[in-house]
């Protein structure tokens, strides 16, 4: 089983960008934690971080042939990207939406997700720990044959 983990805009700055909101862990720290979880679960992972919306869309299309599911922190594109929503829907890959912060406890514009309706689940507000949670949840979902 293979899971892709996609990270959107500004997530390359984790560890230094607003640590009071996003925590002190870097993206490399998060990837290491995910790899540990994946090894325990016996699954392979690949990672992508991009600040470009089109690159995320392309990544979903490529993942259709290489991955069993996707964990995505789409960052700000969560709230704006119909293109990303359409890519998730078109590829039919089981996808978990993830956010480090509780977006519903923040600014009103962060309360709506364009992608949540086409994702199998949502994890938010647990900081860096949300990533291993999302990987674990997606693997469990896939092992259950995509049952809710």
UniProtKB/Swiss-Prot annotation:
GO MF assignments: 3-dehydroquinate dehydratase activity
Which residues does substrate bind?
73, 79, 86, 100-101, 110
Indicate the enzyme's highest-level EC class: lyase
Kindly tell me the pathway this chain contributes to: Metabolic intermediate biosynthesis; chorismate biosynthesis; chorismate from D-erythrose 4-phosphate and phosphoenolpyruvate: step 3/7
EC no. given is 4.2.1.10
* InterPro entries xrefs: DHquinase_II (IPR001874), DHquinase_II_sf (IPR036441)
**Listed HAMAP family:** AroQ
- Protein's recorded name: 3-dehydroquinate dehydratase
Q: List the source organism.
A: Jannaschia sp. (strain CCS1)
């Amino acid at each position: 089983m293979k899971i892709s983990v996609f990270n959107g805009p500004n997530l390359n700055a984790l560890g230094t960008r607003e640590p009071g909101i996003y925590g002190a862990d870097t993206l490399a720290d998060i990837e290491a934690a995910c790899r540990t979880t994946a090894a325990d679960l016996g699954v392979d992972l690949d990672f992508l971080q991009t600040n470009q919306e089109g690159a995320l869309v392309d990544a979903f299309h490529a993942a259709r042939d290489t991955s069993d599911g996707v964990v995505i922190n789409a960052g700000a594109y969560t709230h704006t990207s119909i293109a990303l929503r359409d890519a998730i829907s078109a590829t039919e890959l089981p996808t978990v939406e993830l956010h480090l912060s509780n977006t519903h406890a923040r600014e009103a514009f962060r309360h709506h997700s364009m992608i949540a309706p086409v994702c199998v689940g949502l994890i938010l507000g647990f900081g860096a720990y949300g990533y291993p949670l999302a990987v674990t949840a997606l693997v469990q979902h896939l092992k259950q044959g995509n049952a809710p």
